From Swiss-Prot:
Keywords, alphabetical: ATP-binding, Ligase, Metal-binding, Nucleotide-binding, Zinc
Pathway in which this enzyme or protein is active: Purine metabolism; 7-cyano-7-deazaguanine biosynthesis
Membership in a protein family: Belongs to the QueC family.
Binding site for Zn(2+): 195, 203, 206, 209
Key word ATP-binding present: yes
Job of this protein: Catalyzes the ATP-dependent conversion of 7-carboxy-7-deazaguanine (CDG) to 7-cyano-7-deazaguanine (preQ(0)).
Domain of life: Archaea
Name of the protein: 7-cyano-7-deazaguanine synthase
Annotated InterPro entries: QueC, Rossmann-like_a/b/a_fold
Organism (species): Methanosarcina mazei (strain ATCC BAA-159 / DSM 3647 / Goe1 / Go1 / JCM 11833 / OCM 88)
PANTHER family named among the record's database cross-references: 7-CYANO-7-DEAZAGUANINE SYNTHASE
Gene3D superfamilies in the cross-refs: HUPs (3.40.50.620)
Required cofactor names: Zn(2+)
The gene coding this protein: queC
Residues annotated to bind ATP: 7-17
Length: 231
């Protein structure tokens, strides 16, 4: 069975790739550049991840998506919310995380990316598109949910001749379990970039950084990325 993977270089997409690669032939990785704050880091780190797995990478620019996005993930004039461990619950969203999700929302981003990936998957005879959608974030990002995945699969049954499907190995997992599974699969987490910002080091305060930090704290090991960066 063959697959294409969506790779942002974030914790979830790197973990999903590593897990899927244990049982599937990964044809290529697609990375999107839509003007996101962390774009430079994501391109740099995703290239390292592809080298690790020995797979082809295709970088696709979506300038128009950045142009129509007014939230802080792209718009440098808007502030990215800062959170703490106390603000986040693995099992249910809070008012703070719902606010944070709205502050970084990109219009129909996952829908656009999946449909582009669907074209590549069909053209290459691939059965699956591997994604890092996960259970923890599904509460605040509905386009991470099982219902969304099923809806996309249904659409692909009409729009692709080979019935491409979305494969989300992390769909039922929280971040702590994701880290455990990623380490078991020997994922190159030292080259996974979760931060919404694109600095030399992760900010440690955005929602993505906080969720990641809490997961490593829960299992009692140092984040391989921070170790590599000497933090």
């Amino acid at each position: 069975m063959k697959a294409i993977t969506l790779l942002s270089s974030g914790l979830d997409s790197v973990a999903a790739l590593a897990i899927a690669a244990e049982s599937l032939e990964i044809e290529m990785a697609i990375t999107f550049d839509y003007g996101q704050r962390a774009g430079q880091r994501e391109m740099e780190y995703s290239e390292k991840v592809c080298e690790h797995f020995g797979i082809e990478q295709r970088i696709i620019k979506l300038d128009w998506l950045g142009e129509i996005t007014h939230t802080s993930l792209v718009n440098r004039d808007e502030e990215v919310p800062s959170l703490s461990f106390e603000d986040i619950d693995e099992n249910s969203p809070s008012m703070i995380t719902e606010y944070s999700a709205k502050a970084v929302w990109v219009p129909n981003r996952n829908g656009v990316m999946l449909n582009i990936a669907g074209s590549f998957a069909e053209s290459r005879g691939c059965d699956y598109i591997v994604v890092g959608f996960n259970g923890e974030e599904a509460g605040t990002f509905p386009d991470n949910s099982r219902d969304y995945i099923q809806a996309v699969d249904n659409a692909f049954s009409y729009s692709t001749q080979n019935g491409v499907k979305v494969l989300a190995p992390l769909a039922e997992m929280g971040k702590t379990e994701i880290v455990k599974k990623a380490l078991e699969a020997e994922a190159p987490l030292e080259y996974s970039w979760s931060c919404y910002h694109g600095g030399e080091i992760p900010c440690g305060k955005c929602e993505s950084c906080v969720r990641r930090a809490r997961a490593f704290k829960n299992i009692g090991i140092k984040d391989p990325l921070l170790e590599r960066l000497g933090i």
